[in-house]
Every structure is written in C-alpha cells, then in structure tokens.
Amino acid sequence: MTWLGHACFLVQMDGLNLLTDPVWSDRCSPISWLGPSRYRKPPCKLSELPQIDVVLISHNHYDHLDLFTIRWLGNSPIYIVPDGHRAWFNKLKIHRVIEMKWWDSYSISPIVKIGCLPAQHWSKRTTFDDMKALWSGWGVFGSKKLFFAGDTGYCQGFEQIGDKYGPFDLALIPIGAYEPRDFMRCQHVDPIEAVQIHQDIGSKQSIGMHWGTWVLTDEHVYEPPQKLAQELASRNLDPTCFFALHHGATYHTDWKEEIPTVLETLVSDLDALPQRATSSGF
C-alpha cells in the first residue's frame, strides 16, 4: 500500500495492482494554467508505476479524475467507476469500463470482488453536468478487506457499510480539506468525523488521505494529521489504529513494527509554512 498523494494509492493485493483516484497533473482544474497548483509533486513518475490492473474512481471532480493521467494509463487497466462515468471514458476511446451503482459488485478475479459503497458528496465537471454522475466509495474484498472512502461528508451510510461488510482490515479515509466547516461539512469530513467513520465501519487500521497535496481549503496544509492525533487521544484510541503516511511511503498491512507517521516530523515545522497558498447483497 503506497500513498501517492491526495486520494491516490497504489494497492497491491492478491496478485493485482490497483490505483485509486490517480492524478498526476499539476493543477486540479479544467484549465491547465488556472486553479490550485500542487503543494507536493507526485512521488514518482507514471512510467515508474508497475503494470496497473484496476483503477478505482470515486467521482468526477478534477482532484480525483484527471484527463492527463487517464490518457496515459489508456486501455490497459480496467476502470471501475460510479454510474454515469462511462461516456467520459468512451470519448477517450477507453472502453474497459465497469459502471456500478451503490451496493453493486463486480468480481475482478476469482478471489477479488469490488463493491460500490455509499458516500455523501456531489459531482460536476462542466457547467452543464451538475449531479449527472454518481459518486461513491469502494470496497475491495479478497484475502483482506479494504475500504476506500473516496470524497465524502459524514453520513449514516457508514454505519450501514459497517453493519453489512465490516470489519475491514484497512480503510483509506479523507482527513483534509474541511474548513470552513459551515460550507464544507456536507461534502468533506474533518478528522473528528474521519475517526467516526473508522469506528462505524469497524476498521482495524486506517490511513488518512485527501490532505497535504493541494491547498484547497482554509485549514493549514499540515493541520489534518495533528487534529487526527488529537481526536484519537480524546477517544483513548491507539494512535497506530489511524495514522497518516509521508507522501510516497509504503505501508505493509502485515508489518507490526513502527508505523511511519508524519506527525512527529511536521509539528516543529508548522510556523515556517504558509497558512494558505451488479446487485445489492454482494
């Protein structure tokens, strides 16, 4: 499991290489010269990735679905996407696309099944396509159970996911892009709500994502892992049950030694950093 920034992970399990929400462009914007520029560059080149078997897309916002990256990956992987995304891929002459609605599933191999799971968010890529495509999280069910939350606000759907498919061995949960709360609450969880998701789905361990790659909202770029640690402490939870990785760091799920978190190395640097720059029942 390697964090490649924002919501992008390289997941290697059961003989498959999966990518989640891959974005290698500098700006997450419909215009190449306008919009948020990266705070951190990708930790590797696209050409340095292993052969990718499956790409999971959570929704069509530009920080999660990137034209440049998808064009580079081409028709080699299978793309698993929420309902309403197939036409976008087909325009790129990419046809290995599996669309799903919430609670649908698809067997990607004899031992791995992908499930489309609820999230609370929205979709929009142009002026004319508000809410025309679905958004989702994903479950990967094989020798281990993985949950990828995608982009989401907090909702009761996570209790449903936990009741139906928990516990999960590992969860990838957003912890950043949450201020101001009165505007962002319905679409982006904060670290407090992220910990609640961790508990709702019965995650044994979780990794924080959706932070530190672009400065998209008002909180300090390195605040999310601090607030995450504070929330775990306030609930008397083991700090190793939910942690943040360095960009480009790899975490082995069976590794029981020290976990490479970012909090210790970042707290002392904060003052020097800019504040802002198939069917159900699978």
Placement of each model-derived feature along the sequence:
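Active-site metal-binding loops of divalent metal-dependent hydrolases
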Residues: 22-24, 59-60, 119-120, 150-152, ...
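C-terminal regulatory/interaction regions
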Residues: 219-282
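Divalent metal-coordination and catalytic microenvironments
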Residues: 11, 21, 59, 66, ...
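Helix-loop-beta element that forms the nucleotide-linked donor phosphate-binding surface
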Residues: 89-101
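Pre-active-site segment of Zn-dependent metallo-hydrolases
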Residues: 4, 8-60, 67-72, 84, ...
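Cap/insert and terminal regions of metallo-dependent hydrolase folds
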Residues: 38, 45-49, 54, 78-80, ...
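Short active-site oxyanion
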Residues: 73-79, 145-146
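Catalytic core of the metallo-beta-lactamase
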Residues: 6-14, 108-169, 185, 189-193
